[in-house]
Amino acid sequence: MWFDGGMRPRFFVYGAVVCVLALAGCSTVPPVIPIFGRPARIRDEGYSLLYSLADKQSNVGKILIIKKASAKVSAEIKEIAEVFGKAKERLDGFAKEDNGLSFKMSDLPSMEEKTRAAIESTTTKDLLFSSGKAFELRLLLTQVQALDYASHLANELADKEGNPKRKEFLTQFAKQCEEHHKTVVEMVGGG
């Protein structure tokens, strides 16, 4: 009989091992990115971030429909929106040319996404409920951050980009962002 002394402990041990293995299989483990797919995934994550930024920044000038700013600030904001609008169009073109290129891969941690959404909401409220010089300063400060981030992101993407056409675009876009960044910083400083 298997209930006699020898089989019972062994049956218990086997059962315990099966339970441990089953429970261990239930834990969530982040997916492992295959080595051959990792560069494309990193590239797509970068392009996703750049595309999202270009989409938002291409609309930055719309705030001037409901808020007043000086002619100098308004002109700069409209130029920035145009630069990002053209970048978004180019990115759309690249995606059409290469269906392997995806702009839907931000994969930011949940806390990062929530933090960014909270910052965006607060910034929008601050802009909408300010006026005059305070509004202009807040608006320009948002552009200092966006342009700095965009130029660095585009440069990082350009360093990793194997496609010469996209690499050239990213390099030029980064330079445009750097130029506008300098202009906006001067405007913030009273220049």
Where does each model-flagged region fall?
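Sec-dependent bacterial lipoprotein signal peptides
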Residues: 1-26
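His/Met- and acidic-residue-enriched segments that coordinate or traffic transition-metal cofactors
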Residues: 26-191
